[in-house]
UniProtKB/Swiss-Prot annotation:
PANTHER family with a match to the protein in the record: ACETYL-COENZYME A CARBOXYLASE CARBOXYL TRANSFERASE SUBUNIT BETA, CHLOROPLASTIC
Assembly behavior: Acetyl-CoA carboxylase is a heterohexamer composed of biotin carboxyl carrier protein (AccB), biotin carboxylase (AccC) and two subunits each of ACCase subunit alpha (AccA) and ACCase subunit beta (AccD).
Gene Ontology biological process terms in this record: fatty acid biosynthetic process; malonyl-CoA biosynthetic process
Entry keywords, A to Z: ATP-binding, Cytoplasm, Fatty acid biosynthesis, Fatty acid metabolism, Lipid biosynthesis, Lipid metabolism, Metal-binding, Nucleotide-binding, Transferase, Zinc, Zinc-finger
Protein name: Acetyl-coenzyme A carboxylase carboxyl transferase subunit beta 2
Cofactor(s) the protein requires to work: Zn(2+)
Protein family according to the UniProt entry: Belongs to the AccD/PCCB family.
GO MF term set: acetyl-CoA carboxylase activity; ATP binding; carboxyl- or carbamoyltransferase activity; zinc ion binding
Cofactor note: Binds 1 zinc ion per subunit.
Catalysed reactions listed for this entry: N(6)-carboxybiotinyl-L-lysyl-[protein] + acetyl-CoA = N(6)-biotinyl-L-lysyl-[protein] + malonyl-CoA
Species of the source: Roseiflexus sp. (strain RS-1)
Subcellular location as annotated: Cytoplasm
Length: 300
């Protein structure tokens, strides 16, 4: 027996364990239902959990709504400056910009250009909340204004996908001026008889909501998106009243007439395609006094 034990001991080799090099974000936890989801499966659903929770998309991820290889980017060379030489106790504005650019790979919040949906061309401007909270500064406003003017010049609709925390305080009054600048560009788009379709995604606050996003011809919100001007806590502290639990949600805004429809992300492409077809038909039939597009929208 002793010899058997000695022989069996010699047959084993101790192997040190090797830690696997697993990339970050392979599994993503849903903030709502807490389910762990494999990142490729989540990407296939455009980051919508099976429970219906809509996770945030980066600006370039939104371009999946367009026809494949149809998007041509414009104004990518525009980069924000630091006109005020803004310095906070923690960091300078210049440092904050460099870090945001390094982390996101973007020059600023907005990615803009021209693409198509089911073959119909449109100008596109998409916001990325990861870049300094989607804040509206000089480059943000310039890109939005140019997108509207480009749509007017080409005679095509404008689609904006909007998420923002408000004006960028580091640029002061220059940031606030962008609200008026973008709205003026949109008046030229309206004069060209081209529609502006705005999609509001979580979160959408401040100057973006208070200006161009709220004057679009069609305003679409994603389910559960937080939409407003000032934040919930600021309002409660100001009016000293408790607000409803669903206050400032997309569904609350729809109920009170602030948005035209709430559309799940899985249905957004088809909804946009229908809207573009309706507007194209409306444009062709204007001389014949066609049925108003608002009536046609009731069927969506």
């Amino acid at each position: 027996m002793k010899e058997l034990i000695q022989r069996s001991r010699k047959s084993f080799t101790v192997v040190q364990s090797v830690e696997a090099d697993v990339p970050d974000n392979v599994w993503i936890k849903c903030p709502s239902c807490r389910e762990l989801i494999y990142h490729k499966q989540l990407a296939e659903r455009m980051k919508v959990c099976r429970c219906g929770y809509h996770m945030r998309l980066k600006a370039r991820e939104w371009l999946a709504l367009l026809d494949e290889d149809s998007f041509v980017e414009h104004d990518a060379h525009l980069r924000p400056a630091d006109p005020l030489g803004f310095v906070s106790p923690k960091e300078t504005y210049a440092d904050k910009l460099r870090e945001a650019q390094r982390r996101t790979g973007l020059a600023d919040v907005v990615v803009s250009g021209v693409g198509s949906i089911e073959g119909r061309r449109l100008a596109v401007a998409v916001c990325d909340f990861e870049f300094i909270g989607g804040s509206m500064g000089s480059v943000f406003g310039e890109k939005m204004a140019r997108a509207a003017e480009r749509a007017a010049a080409l005679g095509i609709p404008l689609l904006t996908i909007n998420t923002s925390g408000g004006a960028r305080m580091q640029e002061g009054v220059i940031a606030l001026m962008q609200l008026a600048k973008v709205n003026m560009a949109l008046t030229r788009l309206a004069a060209a008889r081209q529609p502006h379709i705005a999609v509001l995604v979580d979160p959408c606050y401040g100057g973006v909501t208070a200006s161009y996003a709220s004057v679009a011809d069609i305003i679409i919100a994603e389910p559960g998106a937080s939409i407003g001007f000032a934040g919930r806590r600021v309002i409660e502290q100001t009016i000293r009243q408790k607000l409803p639990a669903d206050f400032q949600t997309a569904e609350f805004m729809l109920q009170h007439g602030m948005v035209d429809m709430v559309v799940p992300r899985s249905e957004l492409h088809s909804t946009l395609a229908k809207l573009l077809r309706l507007y194209a038909a409306e444009g062709r039939a204007t001389a014949h006094k066609s049925e108003p597009i608002v009536t046609a929208l009731a069927s969506l």
